[in-house]
Regions:
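Bacterial N-terminal signal peptides
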Residues: 7-17
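Positively charged n-region of N-terminal signal peptides that target proteins for export
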Residues: 1-5
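WD40-repeat beta-propeller superdomains and closely related acidic/aromatic-rich repeat-like regions
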Residues: 20-319
Length: 319
């Protein structure tokens, strides 16, 4: 199950313990919102931000102008925070009952076939033609956006796929699976390229470097791994933060990774990790993690989306 990482209160000691103000978080722009947004995503290309509110409304902001659009999807149930993806033309969302909706930037909605499973993760290919879906009960799936049909499903020994991404060239799909393996597939036909062994505990998320050569993988072990994308071989590991990591994002410009850390007992946000991969130390940003509702990147580097109030968001650059 993908965890909501921003709606529950935390003790101050949990939030700021081990935080090291070694990096700078600079406000980039403010976004007004007509409803309280609980999850956000930086769209592929970094020009827009999409968000989801508790009435299942889909918000879209242009970062250059701050202009907001609000779309309705008529989905049958709540949208999991991880079941949101967008690029320069399309927003994809999925409900906990398995409904998938595609919304273009003019608000036209098209629904895909019902998956009948809780959707916990989504990612669009760089060209926007393919959608990969992770559910709570099954391996990764790849769907064709134009036809709305599923092209293939992956496989696991047991368990589901927790997180998946498509390579920048659109040729490979990488999945972190509940049976502790990291798997790579040929995006065209779903053929398994490799199943690389992981740690004793399951990985939750994967991010792909801008050149497609390196993966950042993290999960229940509480550390971030760099892996060679061609083989799955571990290249380097960060130190452990002592808590599970549920999301990772690699910078497209410098060797750094952002990580969402949850408290292992409460599964509430416990920190935003920052790893300079030239070292082994996984540090934490000196910010309140319960304000973070999304992370991603643009052409210049890593970005956070934070909730300043129910009516205002802040997009901030991590330097």
């Amino acid at each position: 199950m993908r965890i909501v990482f921003f709606s529950a209160p935390l003790l101050v000691s949990l939030v700021f313990a081990n935080a090291i103000p070694a990096q700078t978080v600079k406000p980039m722009t403010k976004l007004d919102t007509t409803r309280e947004v609980y999850s956000a995503a930086i769209c592929n290309g970094g020009e827009n931000v999409a968000g989801v509110d508790r009435e299942k409304g889909i918000h879209l902001w242009n970062l250059a102008t701050g202009q907001q659009k609000l779309f309705k999807t008529d989905l049958d149930a709540q949208i999991d925070p991880g079941a949101l993806a967008c690029d320069r033309k399309t927003i994809a969302v999925g409900s906990i009952h398995g409904a998938v909706a595609l919304i273009d930037f003019e608000g036209r909605v098209r629904k895909l076939a019902e998956l009948k499973e809780e959707i916990i993760g989504m990612a669009l290919s760089p060209d926007g033609h393919k959608l990969i879906v992770s559910t709570a009960n099954s391996p990764v799936q790849l769907w064709d956006v134009a036809s709305g049909s599923r092209e293939w499903s992956g496989s696991t020994t047991f368990g589901n796929t927790n997180g998946a991404r498509i390579s920048p060239d659109g040729k490979s799909v990488f999945a972190t699976d509940g049976d502790t393996y990291v798997r790579a597939y040929n995006a065209t036909d779903g053929k398994l390229v490799y199943a690389a062994e992981g740690d004793l505990l399951e990985p939750f998320d994967v991010s792909v470097s801008a050149d497609g050569r390196t993966l950042a993988v993290a999960g229940a072990e509480g550390r971030v791994e760099l892996r060679e994308s061609a083989s799955g071989r571990i290249l380097k590991k960060s130190s452990s933060c002592g808590n599970p990591i549920f999301l990772v994002t690699m910078s497209p410009t410098v060797p750094t990774v952002l990580a969402l850390i949850l408290d292992e007992m409460t599964l509430h946000p416990a920190g935003i990790g920052y790893w300079n991969t030239n070292t082994t130390e996984l540090k934490q940003l000196a910010i309140d993690p319960k304000t973070v509702i999304g992370m991603g990147s643009d052409a210049k580097g890593l970005l956070l989306v934070r909730q300043e109030s129910p009516a205002k968001l802040s997009v901030e650059r991590v330097e």
